[in-house]
């Protein structure tokens, strides 16, 4: 095994029995042959489960919507990319020549995806207990810094953080109607989210309020919140 990969194993805190799993987890789809997308899918599911389990135990009084918002904050791409940079993961990625030239080893989404793929690889290599231990160790700083105050953000911010945690495009807002006199207007705003087949609507006395209402409706439609949180 490459000494460099041995160094990465020490940083991750896991020594792979099956080195091919580790190499596959570091292989981007731009590289020829098999890639890490299936491992990323598996790792994403494990990450969300472990994070959800930890939050459930840590915040026994939190409501479902609050737990969902905390998890979205915990597993968003930005957080994972910061962890990946701490492991200097970009140095170990297998990328196609085009991605290398464009700086793909620094790109947030590629780093976050590779870290999720490594979680999936650790699970296949050593089981759920090992994967849980690594995830909780990596996220310990973020977990310790979370409070229920973090769930008191406005709907637009919560929606943006949820979508970022899924590596999705940010929502788009558009004013579709304005009614009433200049001193007493009502704005109608549409919110378009890539994960939803239909746009959500919001109405309010200002564009800002209407956008917040539309974002709240999108969170409910996505199943992130139930309208009672």
Curated annotation (Swiss-Prot):
Its cofactor is Mg(2+). GO terms for molecular function: double-stranded RNA binding; metal ion binding; ribonuclease III activity; rRNA binding. The keyword Membrane does not apply. Its main location: cytoplasm. It is an enzyme of class 3 (hydrolase). Its EC number is 3.1.26.3. One of its GO terms (biological process) is regulation of gene expression. Pfam families: dsrm, Ribonucleas_3_3. Keywords: Cytoplasm, Endonuclease, Hydrolase, Magnesium, Metal-binding, mRNA processing, Nuclease, RNA-binding, rRNA processing, rRNA-binding, tRNA processing. The active site is at residues 44, 116. It is found in: Cytoplasm. One of its GO terms (cellular component) is cytoplasm. Residues 5-127 form the RNase III domain. InterPro entries: dsRBD_dom, RNase_III, RNase_III_dom, RNase_III_sf. Mg(2+) binds at residues 40, 113, 116. Digests double-stranded RNA. Involved in the processing of primary rRNA transcript to yield the immediate precursors to the large and small rRNAs (23S and 16S). Processes some mRNAs, and tRNAs when they are encoded in the rRNA operon. Processes pre-crRNA and tracrRNA of type II CRISPR loci if present in the organism. Belongs to the ribonuclease III family. NCBIfam families: RNaseIII. Homodimer. This is Ribonuclease 3. The lineage of its organism: Bacteria, Pseudomonadati, Pseudomonadota, Gammaproteobacteria, Pseudomonadales. The gene is rnc.
């Amino acid at each position: 095994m490459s000494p460099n990969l041995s160094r990465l194993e020490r940083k991750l805190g896991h020594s792979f029995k099956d080195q091919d799993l580790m190499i596959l987890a570091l292989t981007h789809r731009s590289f020829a042959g098999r890639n890490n997308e299936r491992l990323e899918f598996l790792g994403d599911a494990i990450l969300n489960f472990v994070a959800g389990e930890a939050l459930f135990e840590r915040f026994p009084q939190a409501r479902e919507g609050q737990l969902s918002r905390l998890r979205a904050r915990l597993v968003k791409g930005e957080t994972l990319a910061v962890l990946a940079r701490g492991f200097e993961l970009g140095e170990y990625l297998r990328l196609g020549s085009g991605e290398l030239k464009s700086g793909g080893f620094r790109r947030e989404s590629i780093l976050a995806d590779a870290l999720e793929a490594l979680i999936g690889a650790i699970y296949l290599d050593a089981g759920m207990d090992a994967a849980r231990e690594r995830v909780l160790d990596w996220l310990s700083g973020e977990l310790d810094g979370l409070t229920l105050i973090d769930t008191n953000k406005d709907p637009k911010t919560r929606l943006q953080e949820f979508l970022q945690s899924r590596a999705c495009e940010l929502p788009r807002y558009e004013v579709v109607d304005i009614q009433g006199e200049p001193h007493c207007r009502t704005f109608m705003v549409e919110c378009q989210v890539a994960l939803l087949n239909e746009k959500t609507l919001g109405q309010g006395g200002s564009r800002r309020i209407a956008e917040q209402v539309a974002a709240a409706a999108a969170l409910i439609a996505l199943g992130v919140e139930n309208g009672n949180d």
